[in-house]
Amino acid sequence: MLAVVKIDGEKVRRARERAFLSKGELAERAGLDRNTIGRIENAGATEVHPRTIRKLANALCVDPASLTPQE
């Protein structure tokens, strides 16, 4: 079974905008596809591989927990 974690797309978008990055710039920094960034941001809360949330958090210089939904 593949491990997944929830990510909050709105929090990703806000963190990206605070860092003054475009979706393409974030994708390049995180080593992800620009379409993946768009899907995450538009999905609200969605499930991703733990590696994806770590890549995004590192690229945004934030704690991975700050990108997860409050439960």
Predicted regions and their residues:
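A short, Lys/Arg-rich alpha-helix, primarily the initiator
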Residues: 1-18, 65
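Short basic helix-loop element that most often maps to the first helix and adjoining turn
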Residues: 10-29, 54-55
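Conserved hydrophobic/aromatic packing and binding residues within compact polymer-binding modules
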Residues: 12, 26-27, 37-40, 67
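Short, basic-rich loop-to-helix N-cap that marks the start of a DNA-contacting helix
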Residues: 20, 44-58
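Recognition helix of helix-turn-helix/homeodomain-like DNA-binding domains
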Residues: 32-47
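DNA major-groove recognition helix of helix-turn-helix
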Residues: 41, 52, 71
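Short C-terminal boundary/hinge segments that cap the last helix of small helical domains
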Residues: 61-71
